[in-house]
Amino acid sequence: MKKLLIIGASLLQLPAIKKAKEMGLYVAVVDYNPNAVGIKYADEYFNASTMDEDAVLKVAQDFKPDGIMTLATDMPMRGVAKVSDNLGLNSISYETAVKATDKYEMIKAFEEHNVPAPWFYLVKNYEELLTLQDKITFPCIMKPTDNAGSHGVVKIHSYEELLNNYEYSHNNSRHGNVIVEEYLDGPEVSVEIMVTNGDVNVLQITDKLTTEAPYFVEMGHSQPSRLDIITQNQIKDVATKACKAVGINKGPAHVEMKITSKNGPKMIELGARMGGDNITTHLVPLSTGIDMVECTIKTALGETIDVTPTLNCGSAIRYFEVPFGKIKSIEGVEEAMKIEGVRQISFTKDIGEESIPIHCSNDRIGFVIAQAGNAEEAIKICEKVKEIIIINTTLV
């Protein structure tokens, strides 16, 4: 029986843990939280931080897996790559993992390989921030170099705002570094990818719905993209170049970019892992029939994968928007689940918990996923569900 080590045992890793067990693998998980939801589904549990590369390596040396992986999380990829380098497993290199998890190293790689991307400045402290007054134009974006899920990302309209928001971005960075970069105006998309032997296979392009400035939190996704075919081909070209620039030669990739009116697609960032927000675990298989979780597991084990689509459908997810306050009741779920095409309705906060302003992805309270003949119909189903479900709140 082959052994798979999964870094993390949270809700994000649950699809991988369950799929690996379905595939007949012996599964061990690593997580600092002994109560993580995925532990009970695994065969073995190791208590260690997913961010502690040396601890993850020690676990791997003891467990001796045939493959190692993580789903939809950035920083644990460093541990995955370190183990792979040391034990000769099938993953990206540590150098690539750093480029894919440090936004400064990433955008430098884009610049070096002529990948369309924003202008940028690395800021290590407040004194360096003060030197940017005559170098940048507004609006611009300020964000941590080493975080995800929109944490610490803010749109800046003036030099005064730049100074006032520095602490917000700085405090969301693990190492204190932030990037100030060009603001890209236009629709946002992500590209869902599996790389096999250096070949970049674009499985799907995802249209995105985000909150307005300054935080740009993702509130919806749909597939396939409804952009014109010429633009889609440009998107695929930029995504391919971006993956090659950071050195992703195997496994999944999640590439984010905006379609600017003047210069076409320009990179925001990428991850050398599957996309989160249910995009790759749910939307891709619902729209294409391709099981990216299984493909990622097989890649980690060094096995051959098939990325041929077996479906041509539309899929969508929409997150609920509710009044701020303590959640009093949630009504209409049973009725909504009866709607044709609804595949899942989930809530990440319970009755009695607080709904707060959405500044990052963790602030969202739940979502609906739908499947239909095309993306537009899938979106309509999601919006209908949002009308039926009533989430009552009371002021705190």
PLM region spans:
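Short, well-ordered beta-strand elements within core beta-sheets of diverse protein domains
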Residues: 154, 182, 285, 365-372
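Short beta-strand-to-loop capping motifs
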Residues: 157-158, 193, 320-323, 368-373
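A glycine-rich beta-turn/hairpin centered on an aromatic-Pro dipeptide
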Residues: 304-341
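Active-site nucleotide/adenylate-binding loops and adjacent lid/helix of ATP-dependent enzymes
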Residues: 5, 101-179, 185, 197, ...
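Glycine-rich phosphate/pyrophosphate-binding beta-alpha loops
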Residues: 150, 271-287, 351
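Phosphate-binding core of ATP-grasp and ATP-grasp-like enzymes
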Residues: 169-177, 182-225, 233-267, 271-280, ...
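ATP-binding N-terminal substructure of ATP-dependent carboxylate-amine bond-forming enzymes
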Residues: 1-96, 127, 305, 322, ...
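A structural supersecondary motif
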Residues: 266-267, 338-354
